[in-house]
């Protein structure tokens, strides 16, 4: 009798357990159904509607905005947003965000907080599927793709379904607008002036971007190497004697592995990239950087520090082919690095060479 009761008790508990599991799964299912979901761009046709006559109706351009959807850093988001704005101007279209994409709309906070003047340039409106065409790009981060047939495509909404759009060629026509939109506000200008002592105002300022953080354990990207960086800083400092600002997300590592190995300690300053205000590094570059050295060649944030600096002929970057950075297999270098920038390599004996 005792065994029967025990068996009954066990079956009751087991039944309750399975019922609880089923209820939890059902709740998760309902929440997922009711919550925001990724917009399905595959429902939009891919047939290009190319006509030569002019269409007076307002036309729009949009990207799925992968970098915003997945909350990538500021450097990645700036590439995609400015590529959207630049491409829209080239095609005489209005750049928009998809108002029907609930997830996108919920993740615009980084853009809106750090560069509100940029976010304000792109309106959000719902798209009309019947009036839309989708064009698929090759899945490469740093490759300029812009077919001539875009110019004759007359659909009201053109969706360029690609990833990252990391080429300056997409936004070269709006360079002056970009610099205007990223200009430091008055309160930031006051802070920037205070960052440089009076005795250093007229001295040449070399800025070095050092990328560590998630790159250290990232199989796709190569982080900054101390061996290359120390020698590259010496190389640039010889060309442009002056102050050296080490801009990084890992100041402790920079101090121990880089700064302590430079002979001109008094001229070296370490600057930590603000976690929630990375835009300030771009402000600093605009105001003070006479040269920039990019030590992690696939870093988009380092790229923007170089792009926003005072002299585009004094931007130096490490040759990505000499690193184990996997992005080199997805990158067309002439599409990613502007032609005025200078590539630096390293010989077998450790000497820095210009390529």
Swiss-Prot record:
Keyword Iron-sulfur: no
TM stretches of this protein: 16-36
E.C. no: 2.4.1.-
Compartment(s) where it occurs, according to its Swiss-Prot or TrEMBL record: Golgi apparatus, Golgi stack membrane
Coiled coil: none
Major location category of this protein: Golgi
Cytoplasmic side: 1-15
Keyword annotations: Glycoprotein, Glycosyltransferase, Golgi apparatus, Membrane, Signal-anchor, Transferase, Transmembrane, Transmembrane helix
Gene Ontology cellular-component annotations: Golgi cisterna membrane
Broad EC category: transferase
Membrane topology annotation: Single-pass type II membrane protein
Glycosylation: residue positions: 92, 311, 349
Stretches in topological domain Lumenal: 37-355
Tissue: Expression is restricted to the 20 intestinal cells in larvae and adult.
Pathway given in the UniProt record: Protein modification; protein glycosylation
GO process terms (BP): carbohydrate metabolic process; macromolecule glycosylation; protein glycosylation
MF (Gene Ontology): galactoside 2-alpha-L-fucosyltransferase activity
Known function: Selectively catalyzes the addition of fucose in alpha 1-2 linkage to Gal-beta-(1->4)-Xyl-beta-R, Gal-beta-(1->6)-GlcNAc-R, Gal-beta-(1->3)-Gal-beta-(1->4)-Glc and Gal-beta-(1->3)-Gal-beta-(1->4)-Xyl-R acceptors but not Gal-beta-(1->3)-GlcNAc-beta-(1->3)-Gal-beta-(1->4)-Glc. Unlike in mammals, unable to fucosylate Gal-beta-(1->4)-Glc-beta-R.
PANTHER family linked to this entry: GALACTOSIDE 2-ALPHA-L-FUCOSYLTRANSFERASE-RELATED (PTHR22898:SF4), UNCHARACTERIZED GLYCOSOL TRANSFERASE-RELATED (PTHR22898)
Family from the record: Belongs to the glycosyltransferase 11 family.
Protein name: Galactoside 2-alpha-L-fucosyltransferase
Organism: Caenorhabditis elegans
Upper lineage: Eukaryota, Metazoa, Ecdysozoa, Nematoda, Chromadorea
Name of the encoding gene: fut-2
């Amino acid at each position: 009798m005792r065994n029967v009761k025990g068996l009954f008790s066990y079956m009751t508990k087991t039944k309750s357990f399975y019922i609880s599991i089923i209820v939890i799964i059902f709740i998760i299912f309902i929440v997922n159904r009711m919550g925001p979901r990724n917009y399905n761009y595959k429902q939009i046709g891919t047939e290009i509607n190319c006509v030569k006559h002019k269409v007076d109706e307002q036309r729009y351009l949009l990207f799925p905005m992968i970098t915003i959807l997945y909350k990538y850093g500021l450097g990645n988001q700036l590439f995609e947003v400015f590529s959207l704005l630049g491409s829209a101007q080239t095609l005489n279209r209005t750049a928009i965000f998809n108002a029907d994409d609930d997830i996108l709309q919920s993740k615009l906070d980084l853009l809106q907080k750090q560069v509100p003047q940029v976010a304000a340039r792109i309106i959000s409106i719902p798209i009309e599927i019947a009036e839309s065409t989708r064009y698929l790009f090759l899945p490469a981060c740093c490759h300029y793709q812009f077919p001539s047939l875009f110019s004759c495509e007359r659909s009201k909404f053109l969706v360029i379904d690609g990833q990252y759009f990391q080429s300056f060629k997409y936004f070269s026509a709006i360079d002056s607008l970009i610099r205007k939109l990223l200009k430091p506000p008055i309160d930031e200008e006051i802070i920037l002036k205070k960052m440089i002592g009076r005795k250093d105002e007229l001295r040449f300022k070399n800025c070095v971007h050092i990328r560590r953080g998630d790159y250290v354990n990232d199989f796709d990207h190569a982080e900054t190497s101390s061996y290359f960086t120390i020698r590259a800083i010496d190389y640039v400092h010889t060309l442009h004697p002056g102050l050296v600002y080490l801009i990084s997300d890992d100041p402790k590592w920079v101090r121990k592995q880089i700064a302590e190995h430079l002979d001109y300690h008094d001229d070296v300053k370490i600057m930590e990239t603000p976690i929630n205000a990375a835009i300030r590094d771009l402000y600093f570059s605009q105001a003070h950087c006479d040269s920039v050295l990019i030590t992690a060649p696939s870093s988009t944030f380092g790229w923007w520090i170089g792009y926003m600096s005072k002299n585009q002929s004094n931007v130096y970057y490490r040759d990505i082919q000499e690193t184990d950075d996997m992005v080199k297999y997805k990158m067309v270098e002439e599409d990613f690095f502007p032609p005025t920038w200078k590539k630096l390599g390293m010989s077998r004996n450790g000497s820095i060479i210009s390529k």
